[in-house]
Curated annotation (Swiss-Prot):
InterPro entries per UniProt: Ribosomal_bL20, RIBOSOMAL_L20_CS, Ribosomal_protein_bL20_C
Top-rank lineage group of the source organism: Bacteria
Homology family: Belongs to the bacterial ribosomal protein bL20 family.
Function text: Binds directly to 23S ribosomal RNA and is necessary for the in vitro assembly process of the 50S ribosomal subunit. It is not involved in the protein synthesizing functions of that subunit.
Keywords, alphabetical: Ribonucleoprotein, Ribosomal protein, RNA-binding, rRNA-binding
Annotated protein name in UniProt: Large ribosomal subunit protein bL20
GO-annotated cellular components: ribonucleoprotein complex; ribosome
Molecular functions (GO terms): rRNA binding; structural constituent of ribosome
UniProt-listed GO biological process terms: ribosomal large subunit assembly; translation
Lineage: Bacteria, Bacillati, Bacillota, Bacilli, Bacillales
Entry annotated with the keyword RNA-binding: yes
Length: 119
């Protein structure tokens, strides 16, 4: 069998890694070995943080809802319990959006929750 030279494939593979490492600092975008390590690490970070992002946004929504709820004399947990008792199904993302952009609508929801808790 004739000898197979893999120069073209190797060069393409290295070029692909260096292209992915574009914008990295120092030798991390120049040297293949270091760039490859950093590209692998970056992929791990990206994979982890795609899941972390969902948790981070939920935390942010809860913080915003809690702040607006306390302006209405309720804690976050009591507000959510009151909304559940009154049959209002609004997710945390929408509640947080109301708390930031439409405080009067949020206040109406908080009043409904308060009324249900006082029963």
């Amino acid at each position: 069998m004739p000898r197979v030279k893999g120069g073209t494939v190797s060069r393409q593979r290295r070029k692909k890694v260096l292209k992915l490492a574009k914008g990295y600092f120092g030798s991390k975008h120049r040297l293949y070995k270091v760039a490859n390590q950093q590209v692998m690490k970056s992929g791990n970070y990206a994979f982890r943080d795609r899941r972390q992002k969902k948790r981070d946004f939920r935390k942010l929504w809860i913080t915003r809802i809690n702040a607006a709820a306390r302006m209405n004399g309720l804690s976050y947990s009591r507000l959510m319990h009151g909304l559940k008792l009154s049959g209002i199904e609004v997710n945390r993302k929408m509640l947080a959006d109301l708390a930031v952009n439409d405080l009067s609508a949020f206040n109406q929801l908080a009043d409904a929750a308060k009324a249900q808790l006082d029963k």
